[in-house]
Design a protein with these regions (language model features):
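N-terminal active-site segment of His-dependent metallophosphoesterases
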Residues: 24-102
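Active-site neighborhood of phospho(di)ester-bond hydrolases with catalytic His/Asp-centered motifs
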Residues: 49-51, 87-94, 120-127, 200-204, ...
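Extended active-site neighborhood of metal-dependent phosphoesterases/phosphodiesterases
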Residues: 100-188, 193-194, 218-228, 244-279, ...
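Short acidic, glycine-rich surface-loop motifs adjacent to enzyme active sites
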Residues: 190-212
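Binuclear metal-dependent phosphoesterase catalytic core
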Residues: 247-343
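Conserved aromatic anchor
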Residues: 355-368
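Beta-strand-rich modules
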Residues: 405-425
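Extracellular fibronectin type III
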Residues: 422-437
Length: 437
């Protein structure tokens, strides 16, 4: 898609979301800095959250290794903390590639070999748990799940005084309408027990029009049900959209959190060109900690580089308080700033093994990391290459971009690289001249 048309589309989408979330922005307030984590924050509950593992039944699959590392890395982290518990793992669907038995065997094997005493693994079914059977009988997906995981496809569990409610797709593998009454009943029980504490809900698709990816990878029945419960902190996957992106958390009438993927994080720059994989290997999961008063801390962990993201951490006090919305779409957009390159930033040029030109330049950062770069390569007045590329903000360990612009003829070129934030705020462009000999 033409880079200029993309800019128009991005502006339209940003305006549409601003209008849609306008009411929530006014209710929750804007220009409010999220609170820092108190020094005396002491968890009484710790759990990890992932989705979209997509196991294929092979132990050397990268996704299988990452799911294994989720357990081991979280145990290692917990051992360094004052509260050493690792109480639960949530898998918000798509643990398998197609719901096939060998994939479940691998899933169960990883849990059996790595999940220690005191840690519960809570699971719900995603659409991929039905894929193998849809052409003749999707209900077989339930039978296979029950054989390997649990007789209960929907669960309500209490851990350390906190409620966890998991909801699977109906046996068609597509809808939730038949699950609404059950979900309401379980939410009412949880609210009656702990009205001022967070209630953790998880299902595979995003609630419609909440987090990043919920325009086109979502379910409306889930959204309308949860809207009545401000205590809810909902975890969802399905889109694979980058959980490191600030749009992957949103507080409206409840709190929504996108879980990304243990397979590959994805992005969508304009909702027209389609979903794109983020550059390189990417995968992430959340580690959540809750104190005795119900204050919640979310920390994002890079499952590829095995480290936390430095700046992707959300402290949410008073989750059930309707007036406290530090992480609304409107507030986060209001505190966002245009990303800027470092003052001494330069573009270097290299050639890969195929003879194609690669541009190397440092990451740009504002309040949030740059989400994309709009790059133009010109020979004189003629544009010979232009595109919008997703940044490497899906990795906690990378500080530099490498962008392949293809084979260029010998000559002199001008490169312009403009950074943009997740909320489409543009920073000062980096320009450079280069010679292809």
């Amino acid at each position: 898609m033409n880079i200029y048309f993309r800019r128009i589309i991005n502006a339209v989408i940003a305006s549409a979301f601003t209008c849609y979330f306008g009411v929530y922005s006014l209710v929750g307030g804007v220009n409010k800095q999220p609170p820092e984590v108190p020094e005396d924050f002491t968890p009484v509950l710790r759990f990890a959250v992932c989705s979209d593992v997509h196991l294929i039944g092979e132990e050397d699959q990268a996704n299988a290794k990452r799911f294994t590392a989720l357990y081991n890395d979280t145990y290692d982290y917990a051992a360094t903390q004052s509260y050493k518990g690792f109480d639960a793992v949530i898998v918000a669907g798509d643990m398998t590639g197609g719901g096939r038995e060998p994939e479940y065997v691998m899933f169960k094997r990883i849990i059996d070999e790595n999940c220690r005493e005191g840690t519960r693994t809570l699971v719900c079914m995603g659409n991929h748990e039905f894929i193998e059977y849809r052409d003749y009988d999707a209900t077989v997906g339930y039978e296979v799940y029950k054989k390997f995981v649990s007789e209960d496809v929907d669960t309500h569990t209490v851990i350390n005084g906190y409620h966890f409610i998991g909801v699977s797709y109906a046996d068609d593998g597509k809808t939730f309408k038949s699950k609404v009454e059950w979900l309401k009943a379980e939410l009412d029980k949880a609210v009656a027990d702990t009205p001022d504490k967070p209630i953790f809900v998880f299902q595979h698709p995003h609630p419609t029009l909440t987090v990043y990816g919920s325009v086109n990878w979502s379910d409306l029945d889930i959204k309308t049900t949860l809207m009545k419960y401000p205590q809810v902190v909902d975890f969802s996957g399905h889109s694979h959209y980058a959980s490191c992106d600030p749009r992957s958390i949103n507080q409206t009438s409840f709190t929504s959190v996108g879980t990304g993927s243990l397979g590959a994080l994805m992005s969508n720059l304009d909702y027209i060109s389609g979903d794109v994989d983020m550059p390189g290997e990417t995968a992430a999961f959340w580690i959540a900690e809750v104190d005795a008063e119900g204050n919640l801390l979310l920390k994002l962990y890079d499952a590829v580089s095995h480290r936390f993201f430095d700046d992707v951490q959300y402290y949410i006090p008073n989750v059930a308080n309707k007036g406290t919305k530090y992480y609304s779409w409107g507030n986060l957009r209001s505190i966002d700033t245009a990303p800027q390159f470092p003052q001494d930033a330069k573009v270097s040029v290299s050639t890969d093994s195929e003879g194609e030109t690669v541009l190397n330049f440092p990451n740009a950062k504002g309040y949030f990391d740059a989400e994309n770069y709009r790059i133009t390569v010109k020979s004189g007045a003629k544009t010979v290459w232009s595109d919008t590329v997703v940044s490497n903000y899906g990795r906690a360990d990378l500080t530099e971009m490498a962008v392949n612009v293809g084979k260029l003829d010998k000559g002199e070129y001008t490169v312009t690289i403009a950074p943009y934030s997740p909320y489409s705020k543009g920073g000062k462009a980096l320009t450079a001249n280069m010679v292809i000999a």
